[in-house]
């Protein structure tokens, strides 16, 4: 089914679509309470019972995207609210036990899996409260919602989006390009048919990604599609992870032993036909099944012996080491190239684009210049040259019209050829027509964004704890950059002001402090400034000691062999001979303008589990890359993926905007070389089970999401478990092959857990993790100090059993000790003064409307409470885009109220109000809201705010 799209203006800004967010357990408890209005419903957390007071409503956002713009005209906003009543975010994050009377000590348990099954099948009835401007209830709206899609960025938290039933078909047909209808029709005609709903559920959400950097329109006739290419490395060391049947001990009865005949004779049975005739016994076969069928129990009295037997239904991982393994790379997996002429204003280096069943990272280069030069060198007429020999679908496109080149890995609809016509050519036409109907628009999910930390970038504890050394002098050098930077900030206010500039945002007080110091340099002596600096540096040191070390480094987006890709595009006979890189024995050649020609580099990619994932790089400056990709900038790195192991080495890396943390720190570069040579590259050889395990029905969608949710949790668990195994390995002087196997296997388990949203594998990741936990070398459960500290920074409520957390002789704990010893404990003494000492004394005499001041202070308190709720109740990480979208929305609404203009044209913030709010903020009783008040005043009335204080020359 092709959907006729109405014209959408993608150049116009669209407001955020806000929706209610609820827990599925609250929905269930509310429905139970509605049926039992005369009973008090309670639910249990740990061992304590709580009264159920109704559904806890939060807010979520549907970001600006192709999907949200398509749906926008059909959406309805609740009166006097910015909440839309057409979507409902539902989190399935915990099981619940409830009861309807206090005498019930155990309660009734209900699992997330059961609730998914119920609500995916039956949908959800949800009631919205309508309020007037005073917040008073004036009505209710009840709507029926049905499951639409998993939230791709929140799969780990078990989050999905339900949609108003009347809009379901419009939405699902857009998301699936009409393939939903085709699947449904096939299912109704043949209910036993199995479908790739795993892939469909993953790829239908591509048009829902936030268009953080706008949109771009590229006609498909300007896009050349080539087939990717598998290339093999030179023979090298590898650690191959395979799945093998779980073995168990099985007792095999020796049925030929005369003792067995005597035992069964007592039950009037026999194996001997003659005995059966003579004594009238029942003749049975020699098997356990025959014994059981005749009521004969098997116990320890039977003769026989134990054997190890394979259980073909249960698999576990094993590591097989090889010295001459040819490791495959898939060239240009998710990568595309675009001519620099089509790069949108403000975009740099690349544009990561998504559209209908499409995602590709388009790197900017002079591709038309390359085509011209190639044609001249090979005697081809550039203006008439066509692409029917190189285009995957044999399209005869003019080479001079090509604006982008992509590989087939970027087009995900190839996985559904059977639904789209049965042939790839028909499938392409289906996609082309759908894209044309919707204007050939692509959302730009991201482009290059430079580090706000300037020449620095933070690393992660997973990286630092994997470097293959426990030598204190070497690790001292690795930690020195962080130590020196911290000490510089400690005793240098000018450097700390630069730090404030780097870390400023709309929500903190950094910009206020910078403005105040610019107004009067004595502000650096105030308690406000000194306390903020002390708090910031304590936080910085704690983060560093927990693994967030600073290095002169950056996160660089990966591109593979673009010259080879262009040679393939023009049909060159030897496209792998691009004359850019050489194969090295102890590393991989690369090109990035970020570092100098000839420098050695260390690179790490997230997810990162072990030294087997570290890559050693040699930076070179190939002439062809300098000529045809002159503007890629310092945030892109070109890998040589031909004849190397880059993708497996970097934990299943591809080129659809994957990035690596890269540094030229000399000790890290040498440790990377050692790791690359001594720790074999991990190969994920666990077999896929196929994709067609499910029927096209709500119950199977729930079954799939239950499995995916369980596996997603395993991503973090496998990473943590790998760090524990790695720490034990280093503490044991790097000798245990068993521990080495564990962090190798867990690296693969992490890969599989991520891919389970799209594929099925011949291993149960939860069972495998539990098996590893039970191994004798892991049973202690000891947690290295740095790891416990990192967890507590993220979740201050995190607790460990007494004696569980220990300092270990592992790289990160050693570096944390070094930092504790080498960092300055106490800063140089500075004379302090109170903030009120710098206040303009003449302004203190002005009288104000105290009621208005009190109302504004309470508004600020409410804002602070809401901000805490967003982090704690919503379970969002600070890096989460939704976290900032929600925070921005709350801040904008509060600032609007804070500086509101009344019907007479009077603003809340005149000089009198600003003066007295500033005085209120300086009171000790208002220390909890001080920073927020000052931040609001500076954002809304910067000049009036600064005039509250004396300038330097007025002293």
Model-identified regions with their sequence ranges:
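Beta-strand-enriched accessory nucleic-acid recognition/scaffold domains that flank the catalytic cores
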Residues: 1-633, 637-652, 659, 663-955
